[in-house]
Each structure stands twice: as C-alpha cells, then as structure tokens.
Amino acid sequence: METSHGFELLRDETIPELNTRARLWRHTRTGAQLLSLENDDENKVFGISFRTPPTDSTGLPHILEHVVLAGSRKYPLKDPFFELVKGSLASFVNAMTYPDKTIYPAASTNLQDFYNLLDVYVDAVFHPLLSPEKLAQEGWHYELEAADAPLSYKGVVFNEMKGAYSSPDNLLDRYSRQATFPDTTYGVDSGGDPAVIPDLTYEQFKRFHETYYHPSNALLFFYGDDDPEERLRRMSGYLSEFEAIAVDSAIAPQTPFTAPRVTRFSYGAEAGQAGDGQSPKAFVEVNWLLPEYEDTALVMALEILGHALLGTPASPLRKALIDSGLGEDVLGGLANYTRQMTFSAGLKGVAVTDADRVEPLILATLEALAQDGFDPDMIGASVNTIEFALRENNTGRYPRGLALLVRALDTWLHDRDPLAPLAFEAPLATVKARLAAEPAYLQAIIRQYLLDNPHRVAVILEPDAELNQRLEEAERARLEKERAAMSDADVAAVMANARTLQEQQNLPDPPEVLAKLPSLKRGDLEPHHKPIPLALEAMSGARVVYHDLFTNGIVYLDLGLDLRSLPAELLPYAALFGQALLEMGTDAEDFVKLSQRIGRTTGGIYPTTLIAPVVGEATNDERRTTSSDGVAVSHAAFDARNSSLVAYLMLRGKATPERAPELLGILGDVLLSARLDNRERFRQIVLEAKIGAESALAPAGHQVTNTRLRGHFHPAYRLEEMVNGVENLLFLRRLAERIDGDWPGVLADLEAVRGHLVNRAGMLANVTLDEANFAAFAPRLADFLGGLPGGESSGSARFSDTLTGLPALPRHEGLTFPAQVNYVGKGAGLYDLGYRLDGSIAVINNLLRTGYLLQKIRIQGGAYGAFCTFSPISGVYTYLSYRDPNLAGTLDVYDATAGYLRGLELSDDELTRSIIGAIGAIDAYQLPDAKGYTSLTRYLTGETDERLQQFRDEVLGTKTADFHALADVLEQVKDAGDVVVLGSREAIEASGLGLAVTKVL
C-alpha cells in the first residue's frame, strides 16, 4: 500500500467530468481520512469536518462552532477569525453547523494565504481556548445592569436564533426535519432553540469538544492546484501529537413509520387588520423519508423526478398546487444532507381553514402521475436541466471546491464512498438508459417511494398572533424565577461576571500576540487592476457588449430592456414583467410547453434587474424638507438627469453553442408574442412574488433595510426600492387585489410595459464567450436583434420628470413585522457632506466591519452581524446590523464611529492587514459569467479601468491620517443621517425615536 507522510492511500481515481484526480488517504496514527482532489482550479479549498450529533436543542454544536474560531493555543487572540478576515485575500472563510455535522472550510487563490488560513483553522478546531467567558459571549449569559434591575439573557447565538425563529420558512424547515426524524439526532435543533439555549452548561460545552473534535472523528478535504504532497506533509505535522481514540459519533437511522402522521406547530404573526390584505396564512409541507444515499442511479433519478414534479411552473405537482388556489407559492424538493434522504412538497400562504386540504391534493396528483405518467417533454426538460447544471458546475460566489466538499459529505459522513456523489457520468447514463427502456420508470419511483411509503408526515405551521408575547412572557417568568432563587452573592457574581466579560471584550490584543497571526505582506499584493475583456459592437441598432472569456463551451447571453422608458406608474411592474414574459406562454405555446422548451434546450433563462448610479453626476441635492403631514422627508430634489443612473430589465440565459439558436428563438418568441392576458397565471406570479418578498424579511432583513435606506439618497436606489424593495411588496399586495377588481386595467398596464420596453433601440445584449464560439454566434445574434421592433428609444427625456415626481420617503422610518430582533440602519450621502472619494475608505470600512462595529454591536451588543457599506459612485454610506436585540444603542454605536476613528493609532502591521482585506474584497474570485456581468455593469456605470486603478492605488497607499480625515465626514452623519429600522412594532415604538411607522407584515 502506498504511504506518504504518515498517510496510507485508500483510493486513487480520476473523475473526468470534473477534470480531477481524487485520492483518499487515511492517517495511520489517528484514523483521520483525507480526501485530496487535485486539478488546475486556482481557487483552492480546504475543509475540516466533524460528525457532531446533538442530543438536545441547546445549540451546543452551533455555539461551539462560534467559540472554536475565537482564540486558540497558537493564536490566543480575542477573535483570530475576524483578524484573519481583516487581513486575508480569502475567497471564502466561514464555518457551518448542520443538523449532524460541523464544517470549517476556507478558500483562497493565493497559496501563502491558503496555508495561513489552514494553519489558523487547524489550531482553532483542535486547540481552542474554550473559556467560560467565550461561552457567555457567543452562547448565553445573564445580564444585570444593577442589583435591582431585571435580569436578561444575552449572547450572539441566542439572538441569532431568535432571528431564525422569527422566520416561518426557517421554522417550517426545522419542524419538518424534526417531525420526519423524531427518534434521531435530527429530532432536536443543532442551531439552538432560544427557549432551551440557557440550559447549556460550561461542562457540557467542554465535554462536547473533547468528544467530537478529535482527528479520529475528522474528515479532511483539499481541492485545487496546490501541491498534493504538501497537503499531506502539513496535515501530518498538525496531527502528530494525537493518538487514535474511539469516537461514537455515528448518526443512527430513523426507524420508518408504519403509518402517516400529521403534526401542527405555530409561528409568531401579527393579527391582520381588516382590509389590509395581510391576514396571516399557514404553511403546509408533506415530507417522506427515503432510503440512504447508496444507489447513485436512484439518487440521480430522484433528483430528476424532484425537478419534474416541482422545478418549473410547468411541473405537474407544482402546477396542481398553484392552480388549486389553496396557497401562494410552492415549496419542497429532494434533500440528501441527512443520513436518510427526504422528499417534500407543500404550499406557503394557505388560509388556515384550507390547510388540511393540501395533503390530499398532493397525494391525488401523485396518484394520477403514477397511473398516467409524465409528458415526455417534461422529463426531457428535467434531464437536460440537471445535466446542464452538473456539467456547468456553476457555484456562483461559492468556491467550486466547497460545493464538492458538501456533496462528498452526503455519503462520507456516514462511512460511505465520498466519490459517489461527485462522479455523475455513470449514474446519469444509467438513468437516461433506464428512461429510454422503461418510459414508466419515474412512475414506479413515485409509487414505491412516495405513494406506498407509510413514512409520511404532514407538517402544518399555523399563525399565532399571541405566540411571540407568550414566548416573551415565558422568558421573563423564567428569568424572574432564576433571579428570585439568587442570593445576594449570586447577584454580585452575575454582575461581576458581566463586568469581567465586558473588560475582556474591551481589552485590545497585545501587539506581541497579534503579531503571531500569519499574514501576507504588502509586497504580496498585486498592484495592478485586472481589466476584464470588453468589446462594443452595434448590431441592428442595438448595443452589444462582448467579453472574450473561456466559458467551457457555454454561451452566456444577457438581454437588457431599458426601464427608463417607463412612466412612474409602470415602474413597479418591472420585475413582474420579466417573469410574465418567461412564464405565461406565447401565441404558439402555453406556459407549460414554453417552460418545457426552455428546460429541454437551454441551461435556463431568468429575469433580474440591473439598476445602478452612474459615475460623474451630482445625483442628490440634499435639502431637508417636511411633507404635508409634518414628517421629515429625505428626498427633496433628486437631480434626475438621465445619465445619473442606468436601469435595465435583464433576461439572463445560457446554452451550449449548438443550442444557442434555440435560446435566441425562445427570447424572440417571448419578446414578440408573449401572452399577457391569462389572468389566473398572472395572479399566481404576483402571489409567488409577494410571498417571496415576505419570506425574505427575516433572513435578509439587513438587505431590506439597506435597500430602503439607500433609496433616501439617490434616484437609482429610489428606483431599486420601488422595483425590488418594501415599496414593491406593498405594490404587489395592491396588485393582487386589483387583478380581481380591475383586470382590464392591469392587462392594459402590462401591454403598455411591453410597448415601452420591447424596442431594440433601447436594448443591449451582453455576451460572455470565447472568441471562436462568438464568431459563429454573432451573426445569429445580429439576425435576432434585427427581428425586434425598431424606432426611437423612449427612454430618456421623460425619465427626469419621472424621478422628480416619485413620492418622498420619511427621513426616519420604522418598518414593522413580527420579529424578536431588529435590523438597524443609518446612512447619508457623503458627497453631499463634502467628502471627496479616496480608496482609503475601503480600508477603513474593512477595519470598521472586522473591528469596531464587530466589537460593539456583535461581541458586546449580542447582534449576529454588523456592517457598513459605501458606493464610490453614489457616495451613499450606510451602517447596518443583523438580528440585533438592540435599537437605540446600536444607533449610538454608529454615531460614535467618528470618535473611534479620531482616536485610532494603528501599527504598520494592523494597517497592512486592513489593506490586504480591502484588496481581497476588490479582487473577489468570480466565475466567467459573473466576470462578464461585472464588466457590463462597470461599462454602464462609467467605472473605467483607469478609475479602478486609481482607487486601487489609493487603497494600497492608505495611511493612518486617512482614518482621521474620514472621521470628520462621518461625524456629520450623526445629525445628517437618516434612520431605517426593520423590527417589531413594540421595539420600534419603545425606542422613543419617533420613527414614521410602516407595517410591512
């Protein structure tokens, strides 16, 4: 048997579809397995994973994941993880807690940075400093401001999970898993239930790490173009002090039910007001327990079946659920991250009285499909969609290696073949052959694994207007009971512990300790901006932007329709219109056939919007005024020259070169002959969009807040808020009612939108493709564009009037929804305050995010996250918090930022780390399609390579004096800034800030 650096080789295979050599090693001394994926991807990834099965819902694995990265034997800093983030070129750094495992992955394109990350991560997981104070900070602790003050709980994970438990989508996922696996580790919440987290003790915490965080329970992973031998050499050194131990961490399988079950749960909701269209709705999900991940062909068939049933608007189960009118959007699909796989299907937005009708509808639809079969075009579309995604391997902003690690763990975690989920050619070929030989193959799977499967559980999640109040009262009662049981000495100890924790939090890391952290040097940084190829052509009167990039034989085509041609009353339709084009059918095909055609012949087409400010215009004359009702408003006079922003509805498609003509054919059909007159189908699209926006409030509350806040300061962001923000959610609710009461008026609006947008004079095409394939594609693209309506673009003269006429937003706003935490924002337009752009602001923001704001809002305040954002183009600056138990206190932290910067004295090493982190963010790794889209955005907004190089030079040349200079500008934000808070009505009203309140949910 081959050995190297104390590892013995277990497997050595090539995975041609990934262009990868895969070698599986076992560390002979400890038993740790190491999967080494070797290829030419410069975005190198490593991961350290452990089986971490919880036995209760204290959130022990989750809290430990936080604390592990908060100081270790070799790096005894307060927060080496965030210090590392501050000064790394990493393309990914994080840690993730799953129901049965914890993963510590990182990635970088810089080899030395990669090894630095590895060194810190390995020491963190195997030698963390698990102090009681760290558990208190990250998990939970008592807070008592005075001996006679009320007792409270604080902790980062405690508040993070209060935010998670405010999201009905999140709760449905948790409750469905727990109801499907009630007798296993999946039956409890590894993330932590806020009502149970305070049960966690320090002894349990220490014991959990000692039990599971050992090399004998570790799965080690490497991916990319680094030296495979060096992987083994380094890991051998790290593991050398350990001996093998027996770790009982196996995840037990769930014993199948003998009969189906129904379970009911509640989520916190506000009571709907009469006539507001916001009566809280139920969520229903039907879940099946499936076999373990062993037969790769069966897993592939189940993935294809899941897509065929639910993956598109044309999918028969999805269509039956939506057509029933019982709910507003579909949920479900195949999940294979648990030991036994699951399949689920259900509805969001169900009237409580209709909740029990959903499961019978699902079963009846599956029975009909099992008997009558699928439309062959639907199966063809699903096979092509799954195959295209596997071959493209487009993981978006996540490293490809990370996606492969997570896939490998589906089997590896349970002592099965880690390569099975990675090599897809054989199972795909098997399933294709089976489908060709047995047309009823998927019908048999429906029968065996769904209809005849007694392990089925329907989870009904119902709104409860009093739940949040009951939870608060229960927490208060528990605290009062615990306070009453405390002696004077106990009270003194609680206060002393809180003081000790705060003192430790405020104590800076000694320079000699900070110096231990490995870091790159300024000389390791690339001084030059890397341009993305861009060429401009005019084709048939339309602009074509082309990027010559290697795309592995995939045509990426983005078609842009100029939204500036729309009058104000039609702007909120922008995103909906894109969906309507692709999901309502054409004169020749109904939406089912159109959807199948898209799936059969392309890699997908989806709509989005590109709305952004443009360089070089004074975009906001910020004169504060008061509206007629006495509310201060931000938006007094936008300088609405057309050139101050770009706004496009983008239809983003992709296909192989041989299928590119079919991609163009579909785009031509939807632009020229989309049927917009199907009222029922359009209602479905509107309701899906509405509930999607509602579902985003809790998990993406900081983004919702930021979109609204930035809309105070620049017309581009004001338009973004109207098209994609809270304002659009309110529009969708009104539109859903108007479809019933004034369908002819709605249809007239849609036709008017089409009349304004479908015009090649205001259109652009963005193509990302290698030169050889583009030479063949370009004539077809020119023919396609030539077939579209021409004429004068209507997108300019009137748009300034449109922007000027937009209604003002209140200067200080409270957006309310049922939540246990807040999302607190404050911002201003810095150019209006006299700021002149300098690249040093990227360095300063990096330090604020990973230093001051992190310290004050997360570590001391207990929020999950804190951010600051700045647009070099618009000058808009915003502070944001995420899952924050505080409100006014967080605003005080924002207001004190200038004072912090004024008093800041940085060592050269500290300054260098912040510069490195800023460059890492600027040079974020991108796949080819993302590069092409970034280049398009830069072109449209006037971000030239020269301007980007100047900004980079200023980043690299940042000095401490730049921090002090920005303080003078940020000082003005204290008084000139606007406030937007998303949170509960009770918290917003209790803040006493006089915020103008809008009920969002």
Segments predicted by a language model, with ranges:
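Compositionally biased, intrinsically disordered low-complexity segments enriched in Pro/Arg/Gln/His
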Residues: R623-R624
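Non-catalytic terminal extensions that flank enzyme cores
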Residues: M1-V45
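Terminal amphipathic helices with adjacent charged low-complexity linkers/tails
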Residues: V459-R483
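Active-site His/Glu-centered metal-binding helix of metallohydrolases
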Residues: L60, L64-V68, F577
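Non-catalytic, conformational "gating/processing" segments within enzyme and secreted inhibitor domains
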Residues: K154, K206-G237, V746-L781, D975
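M16 family metallopeptidases and their MPP-like homologs
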Residues: N43-P53, D79-H127, K134-E143, N170-A195, ...
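Hydrophobic, small-residue-rich alpha-helical packing segments that form membrane-like cores
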Residues: E143-N217, F221-Q273, Q278-P280, E285
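His/Glu-based metal-binding/catalytic segments typifying zinc-dependent metallopeptidases
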Residues: E38-D40, G47-S49, F158, K162-S166, ...
